[in-house]
Every structure is written in structure tokens, then in C-alpha cells.
Amino acid sequence: MEWERATERERDTRFVELGRYLCEVRSGQYWRVDNLKSFDEFLEKRFPESRRKAYYLMAIHEQLPRIPKPELREVGWTKAIELVKVARREGQRFDSATWLQKARELPKEKFKQEVERHLT
């Protein structure tokens, strides 16, 4: 049980690298090396606890390429996925510096509310 918690904590701190890795596996179809039928089957095998989280990590990698990785690590994956929502909506107009500052300053729930207010 402690090992599982330690593994989850490591995933939470290495989410930037993990998102990049998952995107590479999907785009290169490296899941076929294990004789799997699909990328989803790969995720079921490697991320049995949460395929959704795996897709979140991939979205962070794909949607926030201009944000320095240490800054993403600093705010954490749950706030980074909220940043993804704003980045998708605003596209090239996304002001990452302003939103990163908000992510650093606000508690998780307050930041989520700020994003929801912005998007509605």
C-alpha cells in the first residue's frame, strides 16, 4: 500500500514527462510492440486506475508546449489541466504568464472557480 502511494506521488511530480511519453507512445504506435490492439488497451494495462488521468497528462503536454516544464511542475497537474481548458478556448491569445500566476497564488478550488468563471 505504501509503495502504491509512493508510485502515485512520483507520477504526480513527473506528470510533464509522463504526458510527453504517452503522446510519443500513441503517435508512434509503440503499443503495438506489446501486441496490443489499441492505445486504449495499452492504457488499460499501464494505467488501470485511471485512463482519464493519462489523457489529462497528454492534454497538458499537447496544449501547453510554451510553458516551461518546471513551472508546470510547480503548479501541479490538477491546476495544469485547468490551464489546458483556458488554452484551448483562447488559442494563440492564451496569456500563460497571467494564468500561471493565478495558478500559483490561488488554492486549487479557487483557481478552478476562476477558470470556470472565465470560460462562461
Residue ranges of predicted features:
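Residue-level detector of alpha-helix boundaries and kinks
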Residues: 6-7, 27-28, 68
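Short N-terminal micro-motifs specific to bacterial/archaeal maturation
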Residues: 9, 33-34, 45, 102
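Amphipathic alpha-helical "recognition" segments
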Residues: 17-24, 40-117
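Short helix->loop/beta-hairpin flanking segments within DNA-binding domains
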Residues: 20-35
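Short, charged, low-complexity amphipathic alpha-helix
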Residues: 1-17
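Alpha-helix N-cap/helix-initiation sites
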Residues: 11, 15, 32-36, 51
